[in-house]
């Protein structure tokens, strides 16, 4: 490269470049690529100014040879190539005589005709990228930027190229020649890559064929190819003025950055409409369990055996009747379905050997409830593609629903402690290393805080139901199988307990795709009278099935017992996630662990024990209309767990959208609280994106109302 520079450039340029490098403590013999780049840049600056003069009338003219006596003044003052002190002297004198604003960085030229400084760039990369980097660095509206590349591309501020076509062509030809010369000596690759500091061996994932054509078609405006866009993105410097960047990206974009102040955000608008209804796959706070302690009956652990045993603990059966019909359904069919379950359970018991599974008779009421033969017949596309008015069904927009108080009660209930433990302490071997000791100590404390939590019961109940339903869906596709809803726990005294919540009857389940739906009817015991909050139960038909004797202060009193029956559906992918709801536990453990780590690093010792045992300390749990709620570490664990579990139980596209979009607003508000002076553009569009997700989902509506409480307190 050194030889190449010596042979290709004017000795004066080579000398100036050597001087410039030494001024910055760099060695031209070692940093040969940089040496060549500086020479090239100097030569372009000189060529830019060559032959350009201003005549006595102040017009710009080009004189290549001619009368040496003509009264001509050089159009450009060359600043590049002078030593720093001299260069700044020239800049200062120009500013003093012309009144032009003094630049922060040394420019390359001054144009006496346009009265502006010029920054010349020569790049081996994309001109866009280099232009942006220059613009970001100098951050001055007044300095004109003109970038040339070795491939003949150029870019200048406001597409004002200063010079005539021919002068620019001369520069481009010279750059192209330098590139050819370097390439012929095998120097070009190293030179090209050195600007970017990338590896010489370049491995790229090649995109070809259709994908390549699609990629080229889908580029933003002003990009000719995918490479060109890739390079632009790779070189994008994150700091700097957003407006400028946006206006360079596209002529159509003009973003006004608005300051985000305490008065800027408004609360989210929650929808009006009838109150929202319960949409979980099984009852939560309203569930009633029929339980057996220390089960030791024959076939213990086989769901059907366990269920029959649990049913026997209830003595208050009555003739069932409908007390809250389903608005749209054929309610007598739900009643008949329950009677059929009772009758078929009786049949099972009467058999000599109880079977492990029970398939229900395909009665008219079950066929109706499970939507048998209701699906429209599928026709091969080939047979109907010529139909002229082929179209998809019109589907109705979902009806907006308002937030109802029951979902907050459900959440509060999920945070509470029950009197049973729902997860076992893992059987883990002896600790070997000190870190393992800390880890198992944390896990034990954590387990103690959450093992009795109602949210943990919901996890185990969900895992059981989804596993059983997925199994049955694969093993008995055509059968209406009866699936008991069971969970297991330990009492305070450590006794094992098996609980029955009710039954599921599954419909036909030929599930080819992840999203194919299996319909099921759920029948769940409850002591909740549905007439207290009828809107919560609009999807259910509720029967009264008996009376349960409950201990009260004055002895035992009968309480009416209800059965919530509804048709529901799920899919393989939903059951897969339902089976993995236990993942909420490690997810939460990580959150708690980062809190402990933060404490420990402040105190410079492990704070696990103090963290869990210091009962006087309170932690922020969340924001309510009353302000920031605080509680013990156990309460924090249980609240975070309940949130995580509800995200799983009430998973929906509305929740996905709300979480993603509201997070952006949350980050902006946090930045404001941290005095980072955030700015936004199109805040209205962000609000629209958030509010588009607030339709009818109870959990999303509750989160939105919490978000509003947070906004109120955060901006006080």
Curated annotation (Swiss-Prot):
Binding-site residues, Mn(2+) 1: 41, 108, 119-120
Cofactor: Mn(2+)
GO MF annotation, one: RNA binding
Motif (Nuclear localization signal 2 (NLS2)): 184-247
Domain of life: Viruses
Record PTM: Phosphorylated on serines and threonines by host kinases, including human casein kinase II.
Cofactor note (record): Binds 2 manganese ions per subunit.
GO biological process, one term: symbiont-mediated suppression of host gene expression
Keywords attached to this entry: Cap snatching, Endonuclease, Eukaryotic host gene expression shutoff by virus, Eukaryotic host transcription shutoff by virus, Host cytoplasm, Host gene expression shutoff by virus, Host nucleus, Host-virus interaction, Hydrolase, Inhibition of host RNA polymerase II by virus, Manganese, Metal-binding, Nuclease, Phosphoprotein
Residues that coordinate or bind Mn(2+) 2: 80, 108
Nuclear localization signal 1 (NLS1), short sequence motif: residues: 124-139
Transmembrane regions: none
InterPro entries, alphabetized: INFV_PA, PA/PA-X, PA/PA-X_sf
Main localisation: host cell
Its EC number(s): 3.1.-.-
A single GO cellular-component term on record: host cell nucleus
Leading EC class: hydrolase
Subcellular location field: Host cytoplasm; Host nucleus
Listed Pfam families: Flu_PA (PF00603)
Physiological role: Plays an essential role in viral RNA transcription and replication by forming the heterotrimeric polymerase complex together with PB1 and PB2 subunits. The complex transcribes viral mRNAs by using a unique mechanism called cap-snatching. It consists in the hijacking and cleavage of host capped pre-mRNAs. These short capped RNAs are then used as primers for viral mRNAs. The PB2 subunit is responsible for the binding of the 5' cap of cellular pre-mRNAs which are subsequently cleaved after 10-13 nucleotides by the PA subunit that carries the endonuclease activity.
Subunit structure: Influenza RNA polymerase is composed of three subunits: PB1, PB2 and PA. Interacts (via C-terminus) with PB1 (via N-terminus).
Family in the record: Belongs to the influenza viruses PA family.
Protein name (Swiss-Prot/TrEMBL): Polymerase acidic protein
Species of origin: Influenza A virus (strain A/Mallard/New York/6750/1978 H2N2)
